[in-house]
Amino acid sequence: MDNLNKCLRVAGFLDNSLVNGEGLRSVLFVSGCRHKCPGCHNASMQAFDYGDSVSLKEILGRIEKNVPLIKGVTFSGGDPFEHADVLSELAEEIKDMGLNIWCYSGYTYEEIMDSNDESKISLLSKVDVLVDGRFDASKKEGAPKYAGSSNQRILKLS
């Protein structure tokens, strides 16, 4: 990575979780989301100034402490694709550690691909599983495991 000193606005971090993707994993919650889904589970994280500015070096150090116990890392938030440029660099380092990446986004796979945004497409190329689509509180019942509502998809990308 060119610059481990780059910072990301972090809303929270879980060293280990079993509910944010398959297997034991660390979870990085980023700040900032434009979707503003009614009933959002992480509504406080929608503000782009929520949380703390944390360097990628610090985030990687925290993840490394959890290896070899964890299987992967999950990006959640907020919406990780609001920070695709920085997260793409972080994802590259995580993949080099032999970990898989799950990512939750209110954007659909198609919206990301159609955006022609190089940083978003770059991040997507490093994601193993994308849970996509805006949360819909009226569709909570019948949601697939690891999704918040039934309209969301779990896409295995690699």
What does each model-identified segment do?
Residues 1-29, 38, 42-48:
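N-terminal [4Fe-4S]-dependent radical SAM core
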Residues 2-6, 17, 25, 29, ...:
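Class I S-adenosyl-L-methionine
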Residues 17, 63-64, 118-120, 144:
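Short, flexible, glycine/charge-rich loop motifs used to bind or transfer phosphoryl groups or to couple energy/partner
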